[in-house]
């Protein structure tokens, strides 16, 4: 499992391109019959990519759970959210099966021990994107279809940011301890996300970008608002955003991304926004 430590913004300002990518970028998430796990010390967020092809893959495959989590199983003191970004698949949670189509989401509450991932067609395998945060209480494991997500249209064509925010793991949808997740789709011709930029000092965030057409990229902006840096993102890459950092993006085409947050609270208005004219 890859371990990422927290960084001070003053140190970050001196990082090279490669140092920024090494500390914050997560690549190669989907490898056949493998669990790609990244543990961030920023609010203890866990990011996983799981692509079952020829076998059903347990969540803890090739992970020393006691060494990495200090528990007997991963979700003993954690909750998780999972999206399927590939072909049809399924997740079994302590024997209960959930069929997962493209864009579907599953919230898995704290306390489940046996979590396994499978694909219905090895020629078109599921790609499961998972985030997990510490939890203190068990709620209800809940399947959330893409069609039934709570949708919030935002932006417009004039500002090249017309998009739909699909809220899945959200206080208006279901209770969780601290994990929040959703999926934002940009319309054709729109390329900007999260502009004007903001920070939320009491929550960290992870983005994963996908549906990026071949030979296109997304420029993800991070850092303090007056001292920004960019990370070039390719299809299915993820990036860690500390609480002090903005997290905005601009693509060479439209794209889709999943956002995941955890931290002190779930108050979406607990943030500081910045005018583009004030940024550097």
Which residues are covered by each model-predicted region?
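Non-cleavable N-terminal signal-anchor transmembrane helices
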Residues: 1-45
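A short glycine-rich, His/Asp/Glu-containing loop-to-beta-strand
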Residues: 26-68, 162-205
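Acidic/His-leaning functional-site neighborhoods
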Residues: 39, 175-238, 242-246, 251-254
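Short, glycine-/Ser/Thr-/acidic-enriched flexible segments
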Residues: 52-53, 88, 214, 246, ...
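A short beta-strand-loop-beta hairpin characteristic of the jelly-roll/cupin
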Residues: 74-101, 210-235
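Acidic, low-complexity central loop/insert segments
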Residues: 86, 90-125, 129-134
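Conserved metal-binding segment of the jelly-roll/cupin
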Residues: 100-120, 232-253, 260-262
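Double-stranded beta-helix
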Residues: 122-163, 258-280
């Amino acid at each position: 499992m890859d371990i990422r430590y927290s960084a001070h913004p003053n140190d970050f300002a001196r990082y090279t391109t490669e140092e920024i990518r090494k500390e914050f970028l997560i690549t190669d998430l989907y490898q056949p019959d493998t669990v790609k796990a990244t543990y961030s010390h920023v609010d203890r967020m866990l990011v996983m990519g799981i692509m079952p092809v020829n076998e059903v893959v347990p969540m803890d495959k090739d992970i020393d759970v006691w060494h990495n989590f200090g528990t007997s199983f991963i979700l003993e003191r954690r909750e998780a959210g999972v999206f399927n970004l590939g072909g049809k698949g399924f997740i079994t949670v302590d024997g209960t099966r959930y069929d997962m189509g493209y864009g579907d989401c599953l919230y898995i509450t704290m306390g489940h021990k046996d979590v396994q991932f499978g694909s219905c067609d090895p020629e078109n395998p599921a790609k499961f994107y998972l985030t997990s945060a510490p939890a203190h209480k068990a709620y209800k494991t809940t399947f959330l279809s893409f069609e039934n997500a709570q949708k919030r249209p935002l932006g417009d064509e004039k500002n090249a940011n017309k998009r739909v925010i699909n809220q899945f793991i959200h206080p208006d949808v279901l209770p969780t301890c601290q994990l929040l997740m959703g999926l934002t789709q940009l319309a054709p011709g729109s390329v900007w996300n999260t502009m004007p930029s903001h920070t939320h000092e009491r929550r960290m965030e992870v983005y994963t970008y996908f549906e990026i057409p071949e030979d296109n990229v997304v420029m993800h902006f991070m850092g303090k608002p007056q001292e920004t840096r960019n990370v070039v993102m390719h299809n299915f890459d993820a990036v860690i955003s500390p609480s002090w950092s903005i997290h905005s993006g601009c693509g060479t085409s439209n794209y889709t991304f999943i956002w995941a947050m955890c931290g002190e609270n779930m108050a979406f208005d607990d943030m500081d926004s910045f005018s583009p004219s004030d940024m550097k």
